[in-house]
């Protein structure tokens, strides 16, 4: 027994003892590190991680490293370094690390969000982008799909006139249906039990990702039970059952003559690969049902909670700044009126609204720390050496709250995205990357930007969003997870009198 224990301890020491670095190489400054536990005892334990890592820059600078278990992670907190990682050397840093919780979520790095660099990731990312291209024009035009769901949302909110409600469920339904249409040409009904199940699954996954899971740091602990891992497995199993049922129905009715959604794109790619009607990079093995399911799940996971959260953040900030809300509504009244609905082309007319959306994405970035990247070869950042296999994290919070780039960064100031006349949108700083950049940038950026503008312009055109009668304002401190979620709050819904009068006049003319 003692011999086995000694062998076990020696193995751990070998795995977790800091490895020898390249002779003469200059590495990022590192937090202190101990055998086995790495830098864990020296990392701040309280508060929000993205803010803690930002504060560490005061001591260690805009690029520094730390060890967790056997892994070295480099933290990036300046836009020049971030752009080097994401853009200039995007391919060199396009890998994804293996993380226990994310491996379960992604079925061992399938899909696109958490997949490592390689043929599978490249193929599926390309196919997802091809799917979004389907929705540029005609009956499948993205704007039309968003407007349909915005109509349903606004019609529901009209029934809540005078009530104070949590927007989470109706918003989630609307955004889920947009994603579902892109993936399957299928929409859920409000009372559909599958919809509630999907919402519960997303909530459960985000709850686990918001916790520190020791197994992510020390994979050897997988021999011990973990409540967090069991919860993640249960959520993923439920999610896969729901999506598999839809996938199988779509496969039964699939024909190559009508390609109208993401699943059709994936299935057609498999048909082509099976018939050797494609290049060698499109291996049929990379297009199994499990691979398709993982990619579809990524689109649902990344597309629903992110957009829903940002819309709620926008509403919360408008409740805190009622004069700004009034100015945006005045702009809508003057430039759009009540006889038509806003369109994407109105962004250049409703510049204050667009500036407000951009400022919310700055001050409360949906992903305050981007999903970790991994160096797939020996590389460098600036004049510092980065060894192959090193994890690299861009702290978006640090970029968006840098006092040298943003005047009073903790203040909510949409005007910073407008020129001095307040009539033109500007890009005030390169330290602004709300959707990432480069090969690993968010594939749904165009969709998200359209959703945010169209939903908010429609809501403010039709409704006054007011503080509830109890006078309780939303907290602007987020709940950290993979997504920076706002804490639950209620908003009072009031149909605008000007909207009512315009509708009454239209019905009698």
From Swiss-Prot:
Its cofactor is heme. One of its GO terms (biological process) is progesterone metabolic process. It is found in: Endoplasmic reticulum membrane; Microsome membrane. Its EC number is 1.14.14.19, 1.14.14.32. Pathway: Steroid hormone biosynthesis; Steroid biosynthesis; glucocorticoid biosynthesis. Transmembrane segments: none annotated. Keywords: Endoplasmic reticulum, Heme, Iron, Lipid metabolism, Lyase, Membrane, Metal-binding, Microsome, Monooxygenase, Oxidoreductase, Steroidogenesis. Substrate binds at residue 202. Regulated predominantly by intracellular cAMP levels. The 17,20-lyase activity is stimulated by cytochrome b5, which acts as an allosteric effector increasing the Vmax of the lyase activity. It catalyses: a C21-steroid + reduced [NADPH--hemoprotein reductase] + O2 = a 17alpha-hydroxy-C21-steroid + oxidized [NADPH--hemoprotein reductase] + H2O + H(+); progesterone + reduced [NADPH--hemoprotein reductase] + O2 = 17alpha-hydroxyprogesterone + oxidized [NADPH--hemoprotein reductase] + H2O + H(+); pregnenolone + reduced [NADPH--hemoprotein reductase] + O2 = 17alpha-hydroxypregnenolone + oxidized [NADPH--hemoprotein reductase] + H2O + H(+); 17alpha-hydroxyprogesterone + reduced [NADPH--hemoprotein reductase] + O2 = androst-4-ene-3,17-dione + acetate + oxidized [NADPH--hemoprotein reductase] + H2O + 2 H(+). The keyword Membrane applies. Heme binds at residue 442. Its main location: endoplasmic reticulum. PANTHER family: STEROID 17-ALPHA-HYDROXYLASE/17,20 LYASE, STEROID 17-ALPHA-HYDROXYLASE_17,20 LYASE. Belongs to the cytochrome P450 family. A cytochrome P450 monooxygenase involved in corticoid and androgen biosynthesis. Catalyzes 17-alpha hydroxylation of C21 steroids, which is common for both pathways. A second oxidative step, required only for androgen synthesis, involves an acyl-carbon cleavage. The 17-alpha hydroxy intermediates, as part of adrenal glucocorticoids biosynthesis pathway, are precursors of cortisol. This is Steroid 17-alpha-hydroxylase/17,20 lyase. It comes from Ovis aries (Sheep). The gene is CYP17A1.
């Amino acid at each position: 027994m003692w011999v086995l224990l000694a062998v076990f301890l020696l193995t751990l020491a070998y795995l977790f003892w800091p490895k020898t670095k390249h002779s003469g190489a200059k590495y990022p400054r590192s937090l202190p590190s101990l055998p086995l536990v790495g830098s864990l005892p020296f990392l701040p334990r309280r508060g929000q991680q993205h803010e803690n890592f930002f504060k560490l820059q005061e001591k260690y600078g805009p690029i520094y490293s730390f060890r967790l278990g056997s892994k070295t992670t480099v933290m990036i907190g300046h836009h020049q370094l971030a752009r080097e990682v994401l853009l200039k050397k995007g391919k060199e840093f396009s890998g994804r690390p293996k993380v226990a919780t994310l491996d379960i979520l992604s079925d061992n790095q399938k899909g696109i969000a958490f997949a490592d660099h390689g043929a599978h990731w490249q193929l599926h990312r390309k196919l997802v982008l091809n799917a979004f291209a389907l929705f540029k024009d005609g009956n499948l035009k993205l704007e039309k799909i968003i407007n349909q769901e915005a109509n349903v949302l606004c019609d529901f909110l009209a029934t809540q006139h005078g009530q104070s409600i949590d927007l989470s469920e109706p918003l989630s339904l609307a955004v889920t249906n947009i994603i579902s249409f892109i993936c399957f040409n299928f929409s859920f009904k409000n009372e559909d039990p599958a919809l509630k199940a999907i919402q519960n699954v997303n909530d459960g996954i985000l709850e686990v990702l918001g916790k520190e899971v020791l197994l992510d740091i020390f994979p050897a602990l997988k021999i011990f039970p973990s409540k967090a891992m069991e919860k993640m497995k249960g959520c993923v199993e439920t999610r896969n059952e729901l999506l598999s049922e839809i996938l199988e129905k779509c496969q039964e009715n699939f024909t190559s003559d009508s390609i109208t959604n993401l699943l059709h794109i994936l299935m057609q790619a498999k048909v082509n690969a099976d018939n050797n009607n494609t290049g060698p990079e499109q291996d049929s093995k990379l297009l199994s049902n499990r691979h398709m399911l993982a990619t579809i799940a990524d689109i649902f996971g990344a597309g629903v909670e992110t957009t829903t959260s940002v819309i709620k953040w926008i509403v919360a900030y408008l409740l805190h700044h009622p004069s700004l809300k009034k100015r945006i509504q005045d702009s809508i009244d003057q430039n759009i009126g009540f006889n038509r609905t806003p369109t994407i082309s109105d962004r250049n007319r409703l510049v204050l609204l667009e500036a407000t959306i951009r400022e919310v994405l700055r001050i409360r970035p949906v992903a305050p720390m981007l999903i970790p990247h991994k160096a797939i070869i020996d590389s460098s950042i600036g004049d510092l050496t980065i060894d192959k296999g090193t994890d690299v994290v861009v702290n978006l919070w640090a970029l968006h709250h840098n006092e040298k780039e943003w005047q009073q960064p903790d203040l909510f100031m949409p005007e910073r995205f407008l020129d001095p006349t307040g009539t033109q949108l500007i890009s005030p700083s390169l330290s602004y990357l709300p959707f990432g950049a480069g090969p690993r940038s968010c594939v749904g950026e165009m969709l998200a930007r359209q959703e945010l503008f169209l939903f908010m312009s429609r809501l403010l055109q039709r409704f006054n969003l007011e503080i509830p009668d109890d006078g309780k304002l939303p907290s602007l401190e987020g709940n950290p997870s993979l997504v920076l979620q706002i804490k639950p709050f209620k908003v009072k819904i009031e149909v605008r009198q000007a909207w009512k009068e315009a509708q009454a006049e239209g019905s009698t003319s």
